[in-house]
Amino acid sequence: NGECDVAFAAGRPPGHHAVPDRAMGFCLFNNAAVGAAKLAAAGEKVAIVDWDVHHGNGTQDIFYDDPNVLYVSTHESPLYPGTGQLRETGRGDGVGTNLNLPFPEGTAGDTYRAAFDEVIVPVVERFAPDWVFISAGFDGHRNDPLAGLRLTSGDYADMARRLQALVPARRLLVVLEGGYDLQALS
């Protein structure tokens, strides 16, 4: 019937570093931000959960003062682009709609699951979004050559299931971000 419960945008290049006036970090257009901005302009509340190994500085900057878009980032720190600290929580009307969870090199799935259980899921539930976007970078996979997190394919599946449970069917959009080990991506 042409309907699906989850949409997956397998586009390249990734987008979460791109800001409105320039490309950054392999990213030309901020694909997740374009979709979220369109929905927010129509009065919808959108949560973007970014689990790429790098902080999505572009997405954070675009929505930093927007109360209708919640941005949550889990990422390795220190690592490019050097942003995404705990103290970066939003500005103006957007204070409290930006959450960064920086993790050290070597962090594995058990820590991510605890972060989802204790922080991310409760924050997203309180925000009560109409839509959830996942900026799905798979460069935190333990086999990825560009960083040092220790996530597995099963960890990503678990995080996706937890986020899918937070919104009705057909309200979850997954946008491919980074990931440079082709076997881990498949």
Language model: regions and residue ranges:
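A general "terminal functional-core" signal
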Residues: 1-186
